[in-house]
């Protein structure tokens, strides 16, 4: 699933490592999600959205072309 995690993470001034720490995952997990190589669990997706202070709809792009 495509996402805008990197965009919102950078706007928030967080490194991959800091976001990972706040979400209790590895930096490699955040990197893989940002590069569309791994789809996060629903709980992790909510944790990332909450940490970045955005909605799930803002963060993730539907594969059907919607936002």
Predicted regions and their residues:
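Short, charged recognition helix plus adjacent turn
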Residues: 58-67
């Amino acid at each position: 699933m495509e996402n805008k995690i990197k965009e919102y993470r950078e706007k928030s001034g967080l490194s991959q490592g800091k976001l990972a720490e706040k979400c209790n995952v590895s930096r490699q997990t955040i990197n893989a999600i940002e590069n569309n190589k791994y789809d996060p669990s629903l709980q992790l997706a909510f944790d990332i959205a909450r940490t970045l202070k955005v909605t799930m709809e803002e963060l993730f792009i539907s594969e059907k072309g919607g936002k």
